[in-house]
């Protein structure tokens, strides 16, 4: 028996960051980058879906927003596998 095909568009972690965190909190990319102590270009590229979430970035996001780094890395892995 074959498994059903998931036809949903893969979601980049940058979209989640942009739509679920930055927009609702009214937080700018530059403000988040400063809070995470990373270059603003890193966060800009992630929210533009041009850069992957690394373990380092995942740890920083988890510390800042709560939750765990594994969740961010799982989002990235799911995106990469689709």
Model-flagged regions — what are they?
Residues 24, 35, 64:
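Residues within the alpha-helical elements of helix-turn-helix
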Residues 28-34, 61:
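Short alpha-helical "recognition helix" segments of helix-turn-helix
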Residues 2-27, 74:
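A short, Lys/Arg-rich alpha-helix, primarily the initiator
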Residues 56-71:
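DNA major-groove recognition helix of helix-turn-helix/homeodomain DNA-binding modules
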């Amino acid at each position: 028996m074959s498994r059903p095909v998931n036809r949903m568009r893969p979601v980049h972690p940058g979209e989640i960051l942009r739509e679920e965190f930055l927009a609702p909190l009214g937080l700018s990319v530059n403000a988040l980058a400063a809070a995470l102590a990373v270059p603003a270009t890193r966060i800009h590229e992630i929210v533009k879906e041009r850069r992957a979430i690394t373990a380092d970035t995942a740890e920083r996001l988890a510390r800042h927003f709560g939750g765990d780094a594994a969740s961010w890395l799982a989002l990235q892995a799911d995106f990469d596998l689709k």
